[in-house]
Amino acid sequence: MSGLGAPAEVLPPVAGMRLAVVATRWHAEITDALLAGALRAAKDAGLAAAPAVVRVSGAVELPVIAAALAARHDAVVALGVVIRGGTPHFDYVCQFVTAGLARVTLDARVPVGFGVLTCDTVEQARDRAGLPGSSEDKGREATLAALDTAAVLRDLELAG
């Protein structure tokens, strides 16, 4: 993970896990890079089966699709970009998406990696998308966090 105080990257034990990734189509340059980072992370972690990938129109659609995917996967990653504009719409979308994805995680007991960039500018989003020259790769980070949490949940269930 990136940023001040971030832990060292951990490749979790993923044997037998099923991963799904849902990504928006808005800001395709950025969401495509986030998706590429997520898929690289899944491969680097040693996931045997390729992740299921679903594209949706926008960020508001992420929670309902994440909920459907959580029913059939051990972990889900949600990827998108919301850029602040001149109206309160940004705040409403960000609140809806954040609360919706948290609800999916808690209701389904399936981790949802939060790879939704909520930025003031497109430049900030690009810097977090894993593009050449980016300082961060939030698609990768969200994927590894979701897989790590799924591994912890699996260990807790096995421990009884």
UniProtKB/Swiss-Prot annotation:
UniProt pathway: Cofactor biosynthesis; riboflavin biosynthesis; riboflavin from 2-hydroxy-3-oxobutyl phosphate and 5-amino-6-(D-ribitylamino)uracil: step 1/2
Biological processes per GO annotation: riboflavin biosynthetic process
CDD domains in the cross-refs: Lumazine_synthase-I (cd09209)
Top-level EC class: transferase
CC annotations in GO: cytosol; riboflavin synthase complex
Assigned EC number: 2.5.1.78
Ligand binding (5-amino-6-(D-ribitylamino)uracil): 26, 59-61, 81-83, 114
Catalysed reactions, as listed in the record: (2S)-2-hydroxy-3-oxobutyl phosphate + 5-amino-6-(D-ribitylamino)uracil = 6,7-dimethyl-8-(1-D-ribityl)lumazine + phosphate + 2 H2O + H(+)
Positions of the catalytic residues: 89
Binding residues for (2S)-2-hydroxy-3-oxobutyl phosphate: 86-87, 128
InterPro entries: LS, LS/RS, LS/RS_sf
SUPFAM superfamilies from the UniProt entry: Lumazine synthase
Pfam hit, one: DMRL_synthase
A single GO molecular function term of this UniProt record: 6,7-dimethyl-8-ribityllumazine synthase activity
Keywords of this entry: Riboflavin biosynthesis, Transferase
The keyword Transferase appears for this protein: yes
NCBIfam families with a match to the protein in the record: lumazine-synth
Functional description taken from the UniProt entry: Catalyzes the formation of 6,7-dimethyl-8-ribityllumazine by condensation of 5-amino-6-(D-ribitylamino)uracil with 3,4-dihydroxy-2-butanone 4-phosphate. This is the penultimate step in the biosynthesis of riboflavin.
Record-stated family: Belongs to the DMRL synthase family.
Protein name per UniProt: 6,7-dimethyl-8-ribityllumazine synthase
Species in which this protein is naturally found: Frankia casuarinae (strain DSM 45818 / CECT 9043 / HFP020203 / CcI3)
